UniProtKB/Swiss-Prot annotation:
Name of this protein: 3-octaprenyl-4-hydroxybenzoate carboxy-lyase
Quaternary structure note: Homohexamer.
Subcellular location: Cell membrane
EC numbers on record: 4.1.1.98
Membrane topology according to the record: Peripheral membrane protein
InterPro entries, A to Z: UbiD, UbiD-like_C, UbiD-like_N, UbiD_bacteria, UbiD_Rift_dom
Keywords, sorted A to Z: Cell membrane, Decarboxylase, Flavoprotein, FMN, Lyase, Manganese, Membrane, Metal-binding, Ubiquinone biosynthesis
Catalyzed chemical reaction(s): a 4-hydroxy-3-(all-trans-polyprenyl)benzoate + H(+) = a 2-(all-trans-polyprenyl)phenol + CO2
Length: 488
């Protein structure tokens, strides 16, 4: 299941009943959000608004509104198959030499996939069929959603931002929200630890006072979009990972105004620069926490060129109290995370990010405990191994007899296997999401680890409780007569 571009994916979704075309006039101001929100909560299809009020460009929404569609976007038929994607990433993150001929032969398919990694630069691309520059650029002609009543302005939500630092060979792809500021101005809301912000900081040191080139792709193919939100190893580019998912090299084209490579099949591309020191207050916006966030200053991007396909499609989403698309992406990508964590911590049985925890703020881990203090080691590992979890506020560790995805099981473990003073680990002054207004300082807060495992000698002086369980013989006898009892 491979897609050349977003339009291929739309066609397949429609054939499978996973996409609904809406011909009625719908307003990008609030109405699209309400319709997409109701559709997502009902586990409904992707939506193609063909008649946005006041615009002649259709809007694609709720594209990744179910875990199944996320898996399809990664070239898989089912969410369970994403474990294989995670295993591939784990191998690429820490490759191991084969232990023999048989194992070497077994790795051949992986190396064949690796051949699809290098991006392929093309001279002519669909994303540059129409080129606008200078005064021709008018971002207000795009049907950018105004998602919530208290939002400051329309917000670009699926912009795939392409940057490059002065010391790095490869480009960085990241998805950062962008507030519409004017006909040719947007605010780039990237947090200081994110790849784009780090590239910009390095540029400012190396080229003080010089404009920093940036390109933003809208409506890239699913593999490239998802490559930008997946925990790819630092040595692997997002374009390379997209090639692995797609089974063919990612086609890119040089931007018109700079040397950055953008997805050749993207629907719309914004090109321009950020002038060091040019900042603007961003927000407030309703975000994935379910609240409006604080206003803060972020860099301003001046758009000098806008290129697009003929009859482009604008890809959009909203963020709000879970479930929203980021939460659904988290559920699906959870399956990618598990093998990566297990590669480093083989004792981990399962790892779960409950969507109601705003995608990443709470993690539940089940493990095969092997020694006193083992749960705390796993907690620290989760917080430190992948940068995706540096903002995870709560980590709950349970034994492998607990189902990490069943709250009844987890709550039972917490209330019966934990002593709050002994089994709670608090760490202060750690990086926290800037959108987390509960932290005492913006971007800096605390983390809590909860050891809900059975305690070993050395962790307790008391005789530990033995779980109640009926013997198998009795269960079997009752199974035999259960239907005849006619109780239920």
């Amino acid at each position: 299941m491979k897609y050349k571009d977003l339009r291929d994916f739309i066609d397949l979704l429609e054939k499978r009943g996973e996409l609904k075309r809406i011909t009625q006039e719908i307003d990008p101001y609030l109405e699209m959000t309400e319709i997409a929100d109701r559709t997502l909560r009902a586990k409904g299809p992707a939506l193609l608004f063909e008649n946005p009020k006041g615009y002649d460009i259709p809007v694609l929404a709720n594209l990744f509104g179910t875990p199944k569609r996320v898996a399809m976007g990664m070239g898989q038929e089912d969410v369970s198959e994403l474990r294989e994607v995670g295993k591939l990433l784990a191998f690429l993150k820490e490759p191991e030499p084969p232990k023999g001929i048989k194992e070497a032969l077994g790795q051949i398919p992986v190396y064949k996939q690796v051949l699809n990694m290098p991006a392929k630069e093309v001279k002519k691309a669909p994303c540059q069929e129409v080129i606008l520059q200078g005064d021709e650029v008018d971002l207000t002609k795009l049907p950018i959603q105004h998602c919530w009543p208290g939002d400051a302005a329309p917000l670009i939500t699926w912009g795939l931002t392409v940057t490059k630092g002065p010391y790095k060979k490869r480009q960085n792809l990241g998805i950062y929200r962008q507030q519409l500021l004017g006909k040719n101005k947007i605010i780039m809301r990237w947090l200081s630890h994110r790849g784009g912000a780090l590239d910009f900081q390095e540029w400012c040191k190396e080229n003080p006072g010089q404009p920093y080139p940036v390109s933003v792709a809208l409506g890239a193919d699913p593999a490239t979009i998802l490559g930008a939100v997946t925990p790819v190893p630092d040595t692997l580019s997002e374009y390379a990972f997209a090639g692995l998912l797609r089974g063919s090299k990612t086609e890119v084209v040089k931007s018109i105004s700079n040397d950055l490579q953008v997805p050749a099949s993207a629907e719309i591309v914004l090109e321009g620069y950020i002038m060091p020191g040019e900042m603007a207050p961003e927000g407030p916006y309703g975000d994935h926490t379910g609240y409006y966030n604080e206003v803060d200053d972020f860099p301003v991007m001046t758009v000098t060129h806008m290129t697009h396909r003929k009859n482009p499609i604008y890809h959009s989403t909203f963020t709000g109290r879970p479930p929203d698309e980021p939460a659904i992406l988290g559920v699906a990508l959870n399956e990618v995370f598990v093998p990566i964590l297990q590669k480093q911590f083989p004792e981990i049985v399962d790892f779960y990010l409950p969507p109601e925890g705003c995608s990443y703020r709470m993690a539940i881990v089940t493990m095969k405990k092997q020694y006193p203090g083992h749960a705390k080691r796993v907690m620290m590992g989760v917080w430190s191994y992948l940068r995706q979890f540096m903002y995870t506020k709560f980590v709950i560790v349970c034994d492998d007899d607990i189902n990490a995805r069943d709250w009844e099981d987890v709550i039972w473990a917490i209330t019966t296997r934990m002593d709050p003073a002994r089994d709670t680990t608090l760490i202060e002054n750690t990086p926290i999401d800037y959108l987390d207004f509960a932290s005492p300082v913006s971007g800096l807060g605390s983390k809590m680890g909860m050891d809900a495992t059975n305690k070993w000698p050395g962790e307790t002086n008391r005789e530990w409780g033995e779980p109640i369980e009926m013997d198998k013989a009795t269960k079997d006898r009752v199974d035999d007569i259960w239907q005849s009892l006619n109780i239920l």
